[in-house]
Amino acid sequence: MFQDNPLLAQLKQQLHSQTPRAEGVVKATEKGFGFLEVDAQKSYFIPPPQMKKVMHGDRIIAVIHSEKERESAEPEELVEPFLTRFVGKVQGKNDRLAIVPDHPLLKDAIPCRAARGLNHEFKEGDWAVAEMRRHPLKGDRSFYAELTQYITFGDDHFVPWWVTLARHNLEKEAPDGVATEMLDEGLVREDLTALDFVTIDSASTEDMDDALFAKALPDDKLQLIVAIADPTAWIAEGSKLDKAAKIRAFTNYLPGFNIPMLPRELSDDLCSLRANEVRPVLACRMTLSADGTIEDNIEFFAATIESKAKLVYDQVSDWLENTGDWQPESEAIAEQVRLLAQICQRRGEWRHNHALVFKDRPDYRFILGEKGEVLDIVAEPRRIANRIVEEAMIAANICAARVLRDKLGFGIYNVHMGFDPANADALAALLKTHGLHVDAEEVLTLDGFCKLRRELDAQPTGFLDSRIRRFQSFAEISTEPGPHFGLGLEAYATWTSPIRKYGDMINHRLLKAVIKGETATRPQDEITVQMAERRRLNRMAERDVGDWLYARFLKDKAGTDTRFAAEIVDISRGGMRVRLVDNGAIAFIPAPFLHAMRDELVCSQENGTVQIKGETVYKVTDVIDVTIAEVRMETRSIIARPVA
């Protein structure tokens, strides 16, 4: 009788349209219930039975119920699932398998089966890649996943590397392929094999892509030739190797090993500027005046060189600082090191006065055993030899940026626009409260940005610098020339690492077109999107492997009295994140560890401070002593506690 009743259908429709609904993201808790977060201010409680229909991170539409002044959300429609492709650990045996996603807030095992054609007998503890196939909000009875790839067995010592690479869908090994002979590019190569070129790298480096030669000129001028490995002499544009490099975009440097962009035969041998081996290069000859200015007679050319020495950062630094027992093997090499140090000094001063110089932060290096165990983590400060190479590379990249801009009008540029214009007024207001007066319009110009950065660098602490970081825009890769505010430069285009960066290979091809006087095609914008995405994934992979290794390294320190100096890097409502100064590990200090009385404690991300009873006790950039309270291996998180 009620079937097809238009009045009833209308009533149902009316009820449906009058029922309040909200769209948001599900946030799970460890206690079974959850919240629907609609925005920063508003969230709704999701009771445990309703949480069974959703997963942490799902974007959903929910019906909002009000009972006795308490609102709760009932999930109704899935907008975007949190999990699609994921990695996890397998539970159970062949006929009844489940997978627990490798995520701090996803604890439930999801029933699963192996995909057709996947020839692996999964067992308890195996790591796998899975894809979600069913979801309760899509009309399915329960969650269900399909195992699409076996990663490795549970006790594999190299789990951190293999799982991380699988998670981010990155290659595990070098690309296949060989380059048998050099291309005929119609380039005349200058023979510079008689000059005393040197490379300066880490002792373990095999893919040497830059060699340097310096010469004193009259009028207190210096000449610098930067010679760069020439992979585009072997790899034709559009070839199989070129396409593979284009996809990878960068060599992926992870703790303990790297996955090269090019086949190792090229990266570590044919293109590597090995000592006493003749190699083709793309080179830049520049003249530096007494104050370090790069003069206008910049010259790019093809050449052949023979590096006369593979020098090592620490040994060169020791020798220049008159320590250690290493000596250059000849007076000619010693003279090169002295001249390069002079160039470094001049360029450093020029950049300090006319551009911007980054504050030196140490690099942290993991020393690993044969089974991937962490033997030690050492901080490697940036010393004079590191700065020699850095200044030479920055100078060479400035030269390329100018030549490509003036001769072609395009290239692969690193662009950084400083502050987001939308944030300029808020930035000026914040600085004013700290006694720094800036013009909101001027700070958006390169000169205004540099002026502010120099004022911030002169501050006694880095606190104010850390406060304004959130107002900055991100660096981008662009085919259009543009300024790089972070470096304080009008234009910056890298070409000095073509073995490990595809964008540098593109710039090599463009520079070769300039050398030959040919027209060149502007790179497509899609390539910059691919490069930016790969850079993001590689950085995440490096961080993920690092987190795993830090957790392994500090596990035996949990619950002990071992003290670590730690710099506060971030403050949020829940506590503080700190970086251990000696090894670079990131740890979290929960708010209850800072002060037991929650109502007397204010942790403000906005101000970068922790206040107890109205007094500022901690602020971002403070260095404090901590002990390790706990290391949670399943989430690779380190919990620290301030030393009382």
From Swiss-Prot:
**Residue span of the signal peptide, if any?**
none
Residue ranges of domain S1 motif in the record: 561-643
Keyword Transmembrane listed? The answer is: no
Location (main, coarse)? cytoplasm
GO CC annotation terms, alphabetical = cytosol
Ranges that cross the membrane: none
Q: Which GO terms describe its biological process?
A: mRNA catabolic process
Which catalytic reaction applies to this protein?
Answer: Exonucleolytic cleavage in the 3'- to 5'-direction to yield nucleoside 5'-phosphates
Q: Which GO terms describe its molecular function?
A: exoribonuclease II activity; RNA binding
Please name every pair of cysteines joined by a disulfide bond in this record.
Answer: none
Organism superkingdom: Bacteria
Localization of this protein: Cytoplasm
Q: Which residues form the RNB domain?
A: 189-516
Keyword RNA-binding among UniProt keywords: yes
| Similarity section | Belongs to the RNR ribonuclease family. RNase II subfamily.
Q: Its function?
A: Involved in mRNA degradation. Hydrolyzes single-stranded polyribonucleotides processively in the 3' to 5' direction.
Q: What is this protein called?
A: Exoribonuclease 2
The gene designation is rnb
